């Protein structure tokens, strides 16, 4: 049988071509890995920025809501002293509300979608709000005898809301 001999120039060209293709393949894999890492980092940064923005919005919405409750409380003190009418005070409070329509729903949506870890703490706030509002909606008589208890419940509400604001700040630091 005849032996087939391959000229060295062809063999050198084949080896060079294979080496080049292998180098391109390795380079592409490294580039692909770098791009994947870069994309993941950019996605993480965008996600953190969105969460920070939503946390700021939630904080502002919470403060407006809290201020409305506090203003209602302050307006109700004369009702407990017998110096004002509860219906007139509630009307004045609703006309001068800091919240806009849908603010509380927006707050709840942000809480549930972005910060579910805060739902329990906000539940404590809502429970305390319910106690305070019993004094404002006729659940507990607006008499001078109940004024001290009303003020104590409002002070407890303010402590709970301060604790919730602190938890919001903690989340901001963690982001």
Predicted feature locations:
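Short hydrophobic membrane-inserting helices
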Residues: 1-19
